Structure formats: structure tokens, C-alpha cells
Amino acid sequence: MPKVDLFNQNGEKVGDLQLADSVFGVEVNTYAMHQVVKALLANKRQGTQSAKTRAEVSGGGIKPWRQKGTGRARQGSIRAPQWIHGGIVFAPKPRDYRMSIPKSMKKVAIKSALTSKVNEKLMVVVDDIKLETPKTKEVVKMLNAFNAKKTLIITNNAEENVYKSARNIEGVQIIPVNNINVYDILKYDKVVITKDAVSKIEEVYA
């Protein structure tokens, strides 16, 4: 069973925390993580790119000059792809890029991503993160205490003052535990997570 240090938001160690093997100590499945990240990125694509082929460009129905005797290369239409304003070869058309992933694979991918952060000692567990008023410098101070630059902060309920304080810090993203996904966990170098968020993850994914 993995054990990590438990800190307060000032960066001081206040104890230890045992993590569930079934969530934070699984065998890392890189294939599942790759598939889920690929699906997440594909599902963000609009798929609205479009261009006209030579058949769809208006005009060009008449041969621009006679076949022989001009000294120029033979041409059949001014809308052929080699002409300016001609059609596009293999023109892109609107399409749906969406991919569906089984829930079981998403679950495996989340657990694999969390385990990889624990294994690499890139997960910091904090007993709680609270601010009386929005103060960006307080969050920066906390992150500096953990030597965290490009960081994902996961809280149990994304307290408004903490959210407002962290949202404008470059390279930092804060999300409630209900919104965690593989892409964000892997994208950021370090994960700072509250103790309550860890409990919630273990409750949902164990």
C-alpha cells in the first residue's frame, strides 16, 4: 500500500497518508492511457474544415484554349488543381472525429495516471486548501513550497476563493475532483491534491 507525506498548505509536513492499492498502486497501463487521451483530444475537434474539389468550384466548364497549336501546355479547365482558384485535390470535408471509450478503460486509465504520479513522487497531498479571501500570492507561496511549477490542483469541491486565486497563475489549473481526467493528470508535471479529494477518488475508483 503506497504511503505519502501529508502536508499543510504552508508546505509543512503534518503526517503520513496511506493510499489505496486499488487506485494508487495499480500496474500502469500505458495503452489505456494513450487510448483515453487520444479520445479526449479527438472529441474536442470541431470537424468543420471544408474545401472544394474541382467538381465543386464554380466555372471552368469551357476549355481555356485549343488543344494544339498554341505552344502552351494542354489544359482542360481553369478549375483544375494546378490553377490559381482551382479546386483542391482530396479536399477535406466535415467529419465527426468522436471516439467512444468503454467506462472500464477510462477507469483503468485514471488509476494508471494517478499511480504513475505517485511512483514518480510527483503527487503532493495537502490536508486542506482554504483562503478567507481570493489571494493569488497565497497559492503561489504554497506552490513554491512544493517546488511546483506546471501544476494541476485537485480539490474536493473547488472552493471559490481558492479557484479565483489559482486561475490566473500561468501553468496552473485547478479542478474539482469530479472533473479529473487522464489528459490533465499527465499534462501537468505535478499534482497537488487535497486529502478529501484523495478519499473521494478512492471511493469512486476503488
UniProtKB/Swiss-Prot annotation:
Q: Which UniProt keywords apply?
A: Ribonucleoprotein, Ribosomal protein, RNA-binding, rRNA-binding
Sorted alphabetically, which InterPro entries does this protein's record hold?
Ribosomal_uL4, Ribosomal_uL4-like, Ribosomal_uL4_dom_sf
One Pfam family name is: Ribosomal_L4
Annotated segments matching region Disordered: 47-75
List the GO cellular component terms. ribonucleoprotein complex; ribosome
Report if keyword Ribonucleoprotein is assigned: yes
A GO molecular function annotation here is: structural constituent of ribosome
Q: Which family does it belong to?
A: Belongs to the universal ribosomal protein uL4 family.
The record ties this protein, via HAMAP family, to: Ribosomal_uL4_B
Biological role stated in the UniProt entry? One of the primary rRNA binding proteins, this protein initially binds near the 5'-end of the 23S rRNA. It is important during the early stages of 50S assembly. It makes multiple contacts with different domains of the 23S rRNA in the assembled 50S subunit and ribosome. Forms part of the polypeptide exit tunnel.
Q: How does it assemble?
A: Part of the 50S ribosomal subunit.
For this entry, the protein name equals: Large ribosomal subunit protein uL4
Q: Where does this protein come from, organism-wise?
A: Clostridium botulinum (strain 657 / Type Ba4)
